[in-house]
């Protein structure tokens, strides 16, 4: 499983372009919202619904973790 962690202020292109490409390639990617709330808002105002909140992240051996950049 691949996990992409998203927090408010994430850089949208750094998150959404890889997310789209990985899912088109058939990879199982789960977005994890950091900091609570159902919607995570990027640096340029684009709101994204995370698949799970960070409190539900329990995978001790993920295949990959993606941490997009951004400004809080």
Kindly give the residue locations of the regions a language model identified.
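Extended, subdomain-level signal for the structured scaffold at the beginning of enzyme domains
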Residues: 1-72
